[in-house]
Amino acid sequence: MEKRRAVVSVIGKDQVGIIAGVTKILADHYINILDIRQTILQDFFTMMMVVDVTDIENLDGLQKQFDELGGAIGQQINIQREEIFQTMHRI
């Protein structure tokens, strides 16, 4: 079976617990992180992850959890299937 991948992006003001919160949601759904990049620019936190969503039929439930977490910690958190992300960010 071919892996289906998604991109998780996180942007906001840096604070303790951002990575822990995002990865807990992924772990609760048994989603493996394939790649991760995180940078702090002055007080701003940015992170992108590529995750394996082969066993996840619909990302809407995950996005809802990320929206709730993002609202609680002041971050914009999105998950998109890799092919949609690539189409939206093609130059």
Predicted region positions:
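A conserved regulatory-domain signal marking ACT and ACT-like small-molecule sensing domains
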Residues: 1-91
